[in-house]
A protein has these predicted regions:
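Short, well-ordered, mixed-charge alpha-helical segments that flank or form enzyme active sites
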Residues: 32-35, 60-66, 70, 87-90, ...
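Pocket-edge structural micro-motifs
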Residues: 11, 28, 55, 102, ...
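Phosphate-binding site of ATP-dependent enzymes
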Residues: 85-86, 93-97, 104-171
Length: 171
């Protein structure tokens, strides 16, 4: 606890009930599917029994990671979240160069760059919004070629270099 550079130590793997744990760290990559919901519901029960669950289960259920970023608009490019292809086309017309992505994706999967006049724009947008799914379109930032960085806070302090996703040459 007193060493600010070593937050945790790992013991050998063992099985126990959740309520036997002091702390549980919940971090799971998308998608948010039925299994994710069930996991967070079980963790909510452990939390109610006094287990410290880092990344509160209710918060994980309530906030999509991509949508949560929009709480800080000063840190985000212009963004449209919709299921309406016509609205997306107007956004592309306004900004000329955008990135379109599903709300439940991760790791750069199913992210598309669309420029005004792109002949694939319709099929990309229709695929992302299939079945009435919400999607996100953002103004393209050329600086992304240097990578994006995620900020991890521990006890309110940022941990340097927690996660950086740097596009590969063909991405």
């Amino acid at each position: 606890k007193d060493d600010k550079y070593h937050y945790v130590s790992f013991a050998e793997r063992f099985e126990c009930g959740l309520t036997e744990m002091d702390v549980v760290l919940m971090r799971k990559d998308p998608p948010v599917d039925a299994q994710f919901i069930h996991d967070t519901q079980i963790l909510s029960m452990a939390e109610a029994e006094g287990v410290l669950v880092v990344n509160r289960p209710q918060g994980l259920r309530d906030f999509n990671e991509k949508l949560a970023a929009l709480l800080f608009p000063q840190c985000c490019p212009e963004t449209l979240v919709s299921r309406n292809v016509t609205q997306f086309k107007e956004f592309i017309r306004l900004h000329g160069d955008v990135v379109a992505k599903p709300l439940d994706g991760m790791g750069g999967k199913s992210i598309f760059r669309i420029r005004q006049g792109d002949s694939n724009a319709n099929v990309i947008l229709e695929t992302l919004t299939a079945g009435g799914a919400l999607a996100m379109v953002q103004r393209y930032l050329p600086e992304i070629s240097a990578g994006d960085k995620r900020i991890l806070l521990v006890d309110g302090e940022p941990v340097p270099f927690a996660l950086a996703r740097i596009p590969q040459g063909d991405e």
